[in-house]
């Protein structure tokens, strides 16, 4: 009888069958462990990520590390900002989230997430779920229908993985040197985040793609196929040249045309600046030694003005040392020797601003918590405190019962004004809360409103919060920062400016900026009241205006508002000037350039009207809107434009370029909810093409022409837009949190040659509203430098892209404020 064999007892060698069984069991166990590890590495950390939402942006390091250290485990510290869906903003009735988590918790989470980064999936543009990094196709299909908690966790995980991966950040800032397939080149990374906070990324490193293939399980073939299609469709310029056209991106991603446009416009931008190639080359050489520093620490400004601090208008030390304030010198700009590099605090309880047009009627009190103006001007219907709102029931002293009636009354008095046709660009001096300019939008007219920062507390700040263009400025000792002969109409409604004194120096400044044939609309008390002081002012003004050859067109009284309006017209020829009995005011010297206005003292003289029919000002511009698209008649083909072409051709090419960029890229490709954008600034406008391309949106654009750039501001006005001269080495004359979007096209690389770039970015932060957008187009080195600075402020990088030493950066400002404080002694009073 055969005996059973017991290996342990008999101490005999096990059979080969038993050995095979054990091997299979061990192998299966290892496979299961491996699958479990892969699954946990992709999903597990998402539970921790929830702790690092918008509510805890304080929990992020303040110091940026230089690129050389990134490969050694150091990383850019950036909060995964999950902004509320902008489509649901409405009146902005929800406060912006608070920040209250510690930095130690954030650091621990970042260390864990960094270990898992390499196993992250490369997103596809074919389905939204794959783009968000899901691993299970069944779960992905749920995500397409709205998703749930798992979707948010995976999305937050991807946000952090992209930002924490040192290799990814290095690639993000490297320019591509060859125009090859993106998957082969491995030098570019494009990041995108839609307005609901969902970030997508396109990693063009082929090695990463190969690693992903090895690690993926159930959806390997699908991911690989869609990744390849995404790369070929959305990135490589050669695809467009070969005639391929695919529409595989999801609703949140920009369509293929927009992504291709991001490349095309960058290439076009390089070519368009060929006339400045030498200057750019010298600048880039000078930048090499300064572009590597990425240690940025921010502090909070401690000033008397607090959340309303304007550096060049709140220089208490300089104002106290003024020898005189007779000419409103204390209301003029007095910039500190070293511009501040600290950040302005937010007012307590700051909320997302109410959207236009509701903002014209009411704003949040907590955003502009000032009541003195309501108390001082409440009886004149300027502004009232209504619960948690500040409301604007009438508009101004001269139109208590509404601005629109007043606006229509002016045109009824002088039909030639023709709002929105002949008259398009208006200057409103002493604007108050700018209701006049705010309601002129209804007549297709844009208004540059100005008022000083004076005892009428925060009047310009009210205007900007309402979504109405305005600047802090005063008629003092220097010229206004505008070219000569650009405004169609100048308006003054009880603006309290002593026009008639000192030879009419202030009124002569209006004469400088007013077009020949333009109107001066004056509705101050001397026009219709008979008090002794008013009668004397009216007499002096009448004599001065007659000597200036202005024609009194109309004097009418509005019975509803109870005010009178006098309208004058500037002459279009020099005949009257030549026939005056005495040359007072005198004619300006031929050497006096009427367009020179940056810190130029006022002169009590008049500039003659242009007699040459080819000169600007000799003819009235085309009626609006034809003037927007047509090159001004005085641009000659013999003139060389900014970009090297004949001036009219340069103008047209610039307009076509920006229409293409805005339509194909900015409107759809950057994840911006334009319904929430109202106040826009082009920090380096050339011909105003960017602003012109935004014409159909409910926005207005402040076109800034830097003082060291070609003087093209008159062209901007000629096409029915407006703007201002400015030196970006100084602060802008506006209140903090004034703009929803800033656009900087090849500005910062030029500025850092003569300015402190850190101070410039601090000014950008001051001017931009929380959740506001910054779009930067510049060389790749400058893009990297700016990105490092804004990341140190915990801003959210929506997209960054670089190719052939040119880059594009789109970021969103956060509500983060530093805990460290810097006291500005010159601003303490």
From Swiss-Prot:
InterPro entries recorded: Put_SAM_MeTrfase, SAM-dependent_MTases_sf
Keyword flag Methyltransferase: yes
Residue ranges, compositional bias (Basic and acidic residues): 85-143, 151-160, 168-177, 187-231, 280-291
Recorded superkingdom: Eukaryota
Lumenal side: 39-829
All ranges on the Cytoplasmic side of the membrane: 1-17
Membrane topology category: Single-pass type II membrane protein
Top enzyme category: transferase
Biased composition (Polar residues): 241-252
Transmembrane domains' residue ranges: 18-38
GO terms under biological process: methylation
Family listed: Belongs to the methyltransferase superfamily.
Protein name as annotated: Probable methyltransferase PMT26
Organism for this UniProt entry: Arabidopsis thaliana
